[in-house]
């Protein structure tokens, strides 16, 4: 399973939000490039970057920081936040970014998503950010009436390469991932699912690993890496592609299997 460190950009700095609240941001580094290099040095084989300013503005804002990170590391990068038109997506791919994460336009402009999936096969990921099972948009500032499961099915039909599922109530809280929501999602789609939000410990990671046969192929880890609750090297050893054993130890997770 992929363990993907998250780098959230706000005003050019690396921050973490609490439940997506811009007023509750915590700065972890003034230099996102150093952070990216640190995660790659510790074994990350993929990075997750969110342009928080972009998500709010509806266009890419932290392009300078994104470009600097892309030049500084050799691992593939996925980026989301403010990608609401073809030009923005093309702009990122021109920098060598591997995947574009689309959120708001998946709800508001599905036709555009279909066109982008056709033009950039395998490179369009849909970010489904949910509050109580319903999809939030525009930097999580608005909540729609669309169910996460409905949107996932529609996006799979339109050609999305994968779904990143974020439970907003858990994001930045360290209270554990929403396993039930991930199971529900995995039951209705066959494309890969990447879990995000609330991961706080190796125990959480092992419970997600139990969902790998159902299609949960990766996990994005943010705050827990920055606070030291999870050490990236340990996480990779526990659930990563080269993990010590394919069957996690029996730590009482049988109910998650």
Curated annotation (Swiss-Prot):
Subcellular location: Cytoplasm
Signal peptide (from-to): none
Main location: cytoplasm
Pfam families (alphabetical): His_biosynth
SUPFAM superfamilies noted in UniProt: Ribulose-phoshate binding barrel (SSF51366)
Membrane as UniProt keyword: no
Keyword Amino-acid biosynthesis attached: yes
Pathway named in the protein's UniProt entry: Amino-acid biosynthesis; L-histidine biosynthesis; L-histidine from 5-phospho-alpha-D-ribose 1-diphosphate: step 4/9
InterPro entries hit by this protein: Aldolase_TIM, His_biosynth, HisA_bact_arch, Isoase_HisA-like, Isoase_HisA-like_bact, RibuloseP-bd_barrel
Reaction catalyzed: 1-(5-phospho-beta-D-ribosyl)-5-[(5-phospho-beta-D-ribosylamino)methylideneamino]imidazole-4-carboxamide = 5-[(5-phospho-1-deoxy-D-ribulos-1-ylimino)methylamino]-1-(5-phospho-beta-D-ribosyl)imidazole-4-carboxamide
Any one GO BP annotation for this protein: L-histidine biosynthetic process
UniProt superkingdom: Bacteria
Database matches in CDD domains: HisA
EC number: 5.3.1.16
A single Gene Ontology CC term: cytoplasm
Enzyme class: isomerase
UniProt entry keywords in alphabetical sequence: Amino-acid biosynthesis, Cytoplasm, Histidine biosynthesis, Isomerase
Residue positions of the active site: 8 (proton acceptor), 129 (proton donor)
Gene Ontology terms for molecular function: 1-(5-phosphoribosyl)-5-[(5-phosphoribosylamino)methylideneamino]imidazole-4-carboxamide isomerase activity
Family listed: Belongs to the HisA/HisF family.
Protein name (database record): 1-(5-phosphoribosyl)-5-[(5-phosphoribosylamino)methylideneamino] imidazole-4-carboxamide isomerase
Organism: Nostoc punctiforme (strain ATCC 29133 / PCC 73102)
């Amino acid at each position: 399973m992929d363990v993907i460190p998250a780098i959230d950009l706000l005003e050019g700095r690396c921050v973490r939000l609490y439940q997506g609240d811009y007023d509750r941001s915590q700065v972890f580094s003034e230099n996102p490039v150093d952070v990216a290099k640190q995660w790659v040095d510790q074994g990350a084989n993929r990075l997750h970057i969110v342009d928080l300013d972009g998500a709010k503005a509806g266009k890419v804002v932290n392009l300078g920081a994104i470009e600097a990170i892309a030049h500084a590391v050799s691992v593939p990068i996925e980026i989301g936040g403010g990608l609401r038109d073809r030009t923005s997506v093309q702009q990122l791919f021109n920098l060598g970014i591997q995947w574009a994460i689309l959120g708001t336009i998946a709800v508001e402009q599905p036709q555009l998503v279909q066109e982008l999936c056709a033009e950039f096969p395998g490179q369009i990921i849909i970010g489904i950010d949910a509050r109580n099972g319903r999809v939030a948009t525009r930097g999580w500032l608005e909540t729609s009436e669309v169910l996460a499961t409905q949107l996932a099915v529609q996006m799979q039909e339109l050609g999305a390469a994968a779904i990143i599922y974020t439970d907003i109530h858990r994001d930045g809280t360290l209270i554990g991932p929403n396993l039930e929501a991930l199971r529900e999602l995995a039951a209705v789609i066959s494309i890969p699912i990447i879990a995000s939000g609330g991961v706080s410990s190796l125990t959480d990671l092992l419970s997600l690993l139990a969902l790998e046969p159902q299609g949960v192929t990766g996990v994005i880890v943010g705050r827990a890496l920055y606070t030291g609750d999870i050490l990236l090297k340990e996480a990779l050893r526990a659930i990563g592609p080269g993990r010590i054993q394919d069957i996690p130890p029996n730590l009482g997770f049988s109910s998650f299997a």
